[in-house]
Amino acid sequence: MLPTILRLPAVKSESGLSRSTVYLRISQGLWTKPISLGARAVGWPSSEVVAINAARIAGKPDKEIRALVLKLETARKSAA
C-alpha cells in the first residue's frame, strides 16, 4: 500500500483540531513535524495521523504521546 500524505485541511478533519492547535502540539512535541512537499506546501503521512489519533482515543498521557511522536519521526528518517 502506498503511503498517503495529508495536507492540513485533511489533518484538521481527521483530528478535529484547528490549525493553531496542530502547530501548538508540534511545538509541545505532541504531534509530528510536517514534511515539505514543495516551496510552500507541507503534509503529514496519514499513518502518523492515524497513530496519534489512536493514542489520544486510547487515553494515552502526553508523556506516552511524546514518545510515540519521537518514534514516528525516527522511523520516518530511517525509511528514507
Named regions from a protein language model:
Residues M1-Q28, A51-A58:
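Polyanion-binding surface elements
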Residues L2, A79-A80:
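Short hydrophobic/aromatic patches at helix-to-coil boundaries
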Residues T4-L6, S15, I35, R66, ...:
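Intrinsic-disorder/low-complexity peptide segments enriched for small residues
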Residues Q28-I35, P61:
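Short, solvent-exposed alpha-helical "recognition" segments
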Residues I35-A41:
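Short Lys/Arg-enriched helix C-cap and helix-to-coil transition segments
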Residues P45:
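PIN/NYN-family metal-dependent endoribonuclease catalytic core
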Residues V50-A79:
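A short, Lys/Arg-enriched interface patch at domain edges and termini
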